[in-house]
């Protein structure tokens, strides 16, 4: 059950709805099904269940906003990665109405071609309102960054 709470952010208050894992999973299923769907009409139906009308998927150079643009993004995924599927491959880290998730692009052979993370933000009605996917590894710290404020290199990076 969603629990409403008011969080004060500076001079304004923002109504934030707390969501639990079952609410995220219930809405992520049609979202991932939409990414697997080749039929544009059925894909739009799935997107309407999973996302708000003005929902956005952000990218490094473009924001896909609304059902038509998100569907266009999915069509591009099918063109650029034929036979591949976008799948959920981690549990959820939930902060009120946002969750950090892991996804993978899986080929016909079942092997992961790419892995990434995303921040999924749900609207008060429980549907997705924003997705911020990250497929790239973190870049190294700039050489100019103060040494006393820098941590050790992360595992799996080119610096480690």
Describe the residue ranges of each PLM region:
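Conserved N-terminal glycine/acidic-rich loop preference
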Residues: 31, 35, 47, 51, ...
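Short, flexible active-site loop motifs that bind/organize anionic cofactors or intermediates
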Residues: 14, 37, 60, 118
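Short acidic-aromatic low-complexity motifs
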Residues: 19-50
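Acidic, Ala/Val/Gly-enriched low-complexity intrinsically disordered segments
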Residues: 2, 16-17
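A beta-strand edge to alpha-helix "cap/lid" segment located at domain peripheries
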Residues: 20, 77-160
């Amino acid at each position: 059950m969603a629990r409403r709470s008011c969080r004060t952010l500076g001079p304004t208050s923002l109504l934030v709805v707390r969501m639990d894992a079952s609410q995220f999973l219930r809405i992520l299923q049609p979202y991932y099904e939409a990414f697997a769907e080749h039929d544009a009409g059925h894909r739009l139906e799935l997107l309407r269940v999973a996302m708000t009308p003005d929902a956005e998927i952000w990218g490094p150079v473009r924001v896909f906003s609304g059902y038509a643009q998100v569907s266009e993004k999915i069509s591009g995924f099918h063109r650029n990665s034929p036979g591949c599927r976008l799948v959920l491959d981690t549990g959820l880290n939930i902060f009120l109405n946002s969750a950090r998730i892991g996804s993978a692009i899986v080929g016909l052979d079942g092997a992961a071609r790419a892995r990434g993370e995303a921040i999924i933000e749900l609207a008060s009605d429980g549907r997705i309102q924003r997705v911020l996917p990250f497929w790239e590894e973190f870049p190294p710290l700039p050489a100019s960054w103060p040494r006393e404020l820098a941590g050790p290199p992360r595992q799996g990076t080119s610096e480690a």
